[in-house]
Amino acid sequence: EMGVRVDPDNAVIHVDGMRLELRSDVEHLALNKPRGVHSTMSDDRGRPCVGDYVADRAQRLFHVGRLDADTEGLLLLTNDGDLAHRLMHPSYRVLKTYLAEVPGPVPRSLGRTLRAGVHFDDGPVAVDGFRVVQAMPGKALVEVVLHEGRKHIVRRLLAEVGHPVLRLVRTAIADVRLGEQRPGTVRVLSRPEVGALNRAVGR
């Protein structure tokens, strides 16, 4: 309704089903984390860390989940605590997509095996999607999609079925994609991307 005043710090506005963020101090960023960088905002041992890439920003940011040091790719950073909590909470089943280079060849049956579930001491894990992207001499590039957030879970899954990871890159979280973003760069998420994250967690 035109002429209605709202409190930008507390109001929740939706336009055509998309949540609009009114607070000017809220940031949503995407980092393409390089290999060897630790998923911490500071490191007392002086190792490269995620915080190095956003040290010049005024807002206090935190990373949404983690990637281990040897894993590359998409890592979200924000000061929106509620959104970050929801994205990490297993009940929202937010999908994450990975590209993994593994020893090959990869049998056609592997996708069925991973979708059916693999049992570990800390419980079973099943992928939401799996496909072979490229077959190469002695190795293969595979895509793994899953909502599970357990530590090292992609590496554990593929090692368990006989294809230990040689290289791992996270390429998407929900509908936010890494695309052609260069390693070590940070970009601001677009309004549609933020809207997609909000929808993924029921906001």
Protein language model features and the residues they cover:
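Basic, flexible Lys/Arg- and Gly-enriched helix-loop patches that mediate nucleic-acid binding at interfaces
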Residues: 1-203
